[in-house]
Amino acid sequence: MIPGEYQIQPGDIELNVGRRTVTLSVANSGDRPIQVGSHYHFFETNDALTFDRAASRGMRLNIPAGTAVRFEPGQSREIELVDLSGGRRVFGFAGRIMGDL
């Protein structure tokens, strides 16, 4: 083995197996691009993003860790969200929850 080398088993790696997901239509009504990271509480994203915010409470983007989705001005797209796991307590971000979900 070479230091730092990955030895990945063949086949697909499934993310977030068995967790609740929801698909939402999201539009950027602003005049600047908005980028949302993989573990950002989607409910608390920039107010220029228009979508069913209540349906996104306690959820994040269902994408690989360390990646992000970019919404260009005027762009609309379908995104998939997945339930946050762990203790289901949210602090920080935009400060809209600050505690248990």
From Swiss-Prot:
Q: Name one GO cellular component term.
A: urease complex
Quote the subunit structure annotation. Answer: Heterotrimer of UreA (gamma), UreB (beta) and UreC (alpha) subunits. Three heterotrimers associate to form the active enzyme.
Q: Which organism is it from?
A: Pseudomonas fluorescens (strain SBW25)
Q: Write the record's keywords in alphabetical order, separated by commas.
A: Cytoplasm, Hydrolase
An annotated Gene Ontology molecular function: urease activity
Which one GO biological process term can you cite for this protein?
urea catabolic process
Q: In which pathway does it act?
A: Nitrogen metabolism; urea degradation; CO(2) and NH(3) from urea (urease route): step 1/1
Superkingdom in the source lineage: Bacteria
Q: What EC number(s) are associated with this protein in UniProt?
A: 3.5.1.5
Q: What reaction gets catalysed by this protein?
A: urea + 2 H2O + H(+) = hydrogencarbonate + 2 NH4(+)
Q: State the protein's name.
A: Urease subunit beta
User: Which Pfam family, an example, fits this chain?
Assistant: Urease_beta
Recorded family membership? Belongs to the urease beta subunit family.
Which EC class is the enzyme in? hydrolase
What intrachain disulfides are recorded? none
Which PANTHER family does UniProt cross-reference here?
A: UREASE (PTHR33569:SF1)
Q: Where in the cell is it found?
A: Cytoplasm
